[in-house]
Each structure stands twice: as structure tokens, then as C-alpha cells.
């Protein structure tokens, strides 16, 4: 079998490292800093900006435990996948992306993730898949409880909040209010 030739370095330069592509690139670094501030506002400790932490998911004394750590990984991986998609688009089209475009795409993906998780609150496999209840001999437990959802996405009401229905209202109950915007991870005014 033939071996593919090694990738050629760009004219007059070196091959780009993953560390540069995802942590140091001027188009990505502002989004990293945005996510660090968002995570801090959500009550987390800002992790070190190192390749093992951001690219491999390594944890240390800074890391939260349990559900909060899972939330951190969801945020981190969503940022990395969004940056990767924009880099692939740049490679295909030659169109360079800007930091604000990366942040906007990240916010959109996170909003979709939060909304999808909200759809799972109180729902069971039967509710979401169209499966027959008889396929589940025991009562299927919900994917998410309200408490689990609030613990992940409603900490300090930065990303989302759940509002009870107004008094006397009829309908399905609690309402999801998405609060996540590009300003959610922006530096404080005057900083």
C-alpha cells in the first residue's frame, strides 16, 4: 500500500499546531476568553489555558466535580467543535472568520443545546422516540428532572432561567427563558 506524502508546510512557514489552532489563533482566542468569563459567571473556576485542559479535557485543582464538570466539558467541546467547523469552512471557501462570528456561532449552538435539554425535562424515551410503552416494563424515568436542568443551565441565571407560569395561567407549566447572548461572556463594562 502506498503511503501518503507528509503534508507540506505553508510557503515560508511551519505547520500549524492544534494548540495554536484552538487556543492561540487570533480568531479563536477571544472566544476562549469569552467562554472563560461565561464559566466564571456560572460559578466555575477559570481553568488554565493549556492544551491538556482545553483540548484533552484534563482536570486539576481548578475543576468542579460532578455535574458542574460535565457542564464545563459541554461548553468546552461546543467551543472546539464550533471553531473546527469555521476553520473547515475557511479551508473550503477561503473566507476567514472573525472572533465575533465564532462567538455568535457558539452562542447559537449553546442555545440549541439548552433548548434540547429543556425538551428532555420530564420526558421519557417513550415520549421522545415514539416507542411503545409496552417495550418498557418498568415505568421509564425522565431523561432530566427540573433540578438537573437547573443545576446545569440555570446557575446564577446566566445561560437560562426557568420561570413559573403566572398566577391563574393555564398551560404546560414552567417556561424556559434563554438568557445566553454574546454579551453573556463579554468583559465587564470598563474592563
Name the predicted role of every residue range.
Residues 1-191:
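Family-specific functional microsites
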Amino acid at each position: 500500500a502506498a503511503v501518503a506524502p507528509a503534508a507540506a508546510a505553508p510557503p515560508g512557514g511551519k505547520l500549524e499546531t492544534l494548540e495554536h489552532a484552538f487556543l492561540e489563533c487570533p480568531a479563536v482566542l477571544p472566544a476562549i476568553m469569552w467562554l472563560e468569563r461565561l464559566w466564571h459567571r456560572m460559578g466555575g473556576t477559570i481553568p488554565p489555558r493549556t492544551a491538556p485542559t482545553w483540548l484533552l479535557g484534563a482536570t486539576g485543582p481548578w475543576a468542579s466535580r460532578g455535574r458542574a464538570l460535565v457542564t464545563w466539558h459541554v461548553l468546552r467541546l461546543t467551543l472546539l467543535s464550533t471553531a473546527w467547523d469555521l476553520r473547515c469552512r475557511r479551508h473550503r471557501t477561503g473566507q476567514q472568520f472573525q472572533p465575533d462570528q465564532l462567538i455568535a456561532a457558539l452562542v447559537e449552538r449553546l442555545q440549541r443545546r439548552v433548548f434540547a435539554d429543556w425538551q428532555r425535562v420530564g420526558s421519557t424515551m417513550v415520549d421522545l422516540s415514539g416507542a411503545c410503552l409496552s417495550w418498557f416494563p418498568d415505568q421509564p424515568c425522565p431523561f432530566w428532572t427540573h433540578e438537573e436542568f437547573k443545576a446545569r443551565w440555570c446557575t446564577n441565571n446566566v445561560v437560562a432561567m426557568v420561570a413559573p407560569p403566572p398566577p391563574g395561567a393555564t398551560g404546560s407549566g414552567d417556561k424556559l427563558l434563554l438568557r445566553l447572548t454574546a454579551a453573556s461572556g463579554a468583559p465587564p463594562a470598563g474592563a
